[in-house]
Structures are given as structure tokens and as C-alpha cells.
């Protein structure tokens, strides 16, 4: 299942901010059931988008190392 086009166009920061708003509204318990379900579904899509963006950023990060002969080189950074 692909995410809605408006979510796909969001930056990580935009998606995270909206996700935080949704969480706050859901935690308040004030929304009707159907609205809560819609918010939950959108929140799940936003969460997936944020995870995808974070993974893409992680893959782009490289560690600069001294290669053979003292020349600088880069290699994928290790996380975890």
C-alpha cells in the first residue's frame, strides 16, 4: 500500500510535526470514533514515511576514513 501523495511530498520534519499533532488529538480522547480511526490511519502512514526518510538519510551518511597510502576515503557509517 503506497502512502497518499500529500504525505509522499512531505519533508521528515513536516510529517513528524503532523504525526505529533495527531498523537496529541488521539490522546485527548475528544475525537469521535470515525475521526479517531481516520487519524490513526493517517498517523500510521506518516510514521511509515518518517521511517523511510530516516532510513534514506542513514544510507546517505558516510564516514570519512584514511584509506591506503594515507589518502582520505569514505565508507558507509555503521550505526547501532
From Swiss-Prot:
GO biological process, one term: DNA catabolic process
Subunit structure of this chain's protein: Heterooligomer composed of large and small subunits.
Biological role: Bidirectionally degrades single-stranded DNA into large acid-insoluble oligonucleotides, which are then degraded further into small acid-soluble oligonucleotides.
GO cellular component, one term: exodeoxyribonuclease VII complex
GO terms for MF: exodeoxyribonuclease VII activity
Lineage top rank: taxon: Bacteria
Catalytic activity from the UniProt record: Exonucleolytic cleavage in either 5'- to 3'- or 3'- to 5'-direction to yield nucleoside 5'-phosphates
Any one Pfam family match given in the protein's UniProt record, by short name: Exonuc_VII_S
Keyword DNA repair: no
Protein's name according to its UniProt entry: Exodeoxyribonuclease 7 small subunit
HAMAP family named among the record's database cross-references: Exonuc_7_S
Keyword Hydrolase: yes
Record key words, sorted: Cytoplasm, Exonuclease, Hydrolase, Nuclease
Compartments, as annotated in UniProt: Cytoplasm
Cross-referenced InterPro entries: Exonuc_VII_S, Exonuc_VII_ssu_sf
EC code(s) of this entry: 3.1.11.6
Family, per entry: Belongs to the XseB family.
Amino acid at each position: 500500500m503506497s502512502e497518499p501523495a500529500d504525505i509522499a511530498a512531505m519533508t521528515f520534519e513536516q510529517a513528524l510535526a503532523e504525526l505529533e499533532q495527531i498523537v496529541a488529538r488521539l490522546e485527548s480522547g475528544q475525537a469521535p470514533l470515525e475521526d479517531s480511526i481516520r487519524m490513526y490511519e493517517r498517523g500510521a502512514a506518516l510514521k511509515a514515511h518518517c521511517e523511510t526518510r530516516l532510513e534514506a538519510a542513514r544510507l546517505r551518511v558516510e564516514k570519512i576514513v584514511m584509506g591506503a597510502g594515507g589518502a582520505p576515503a569514505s565508507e558507509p557509517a555503521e550505526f547501532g
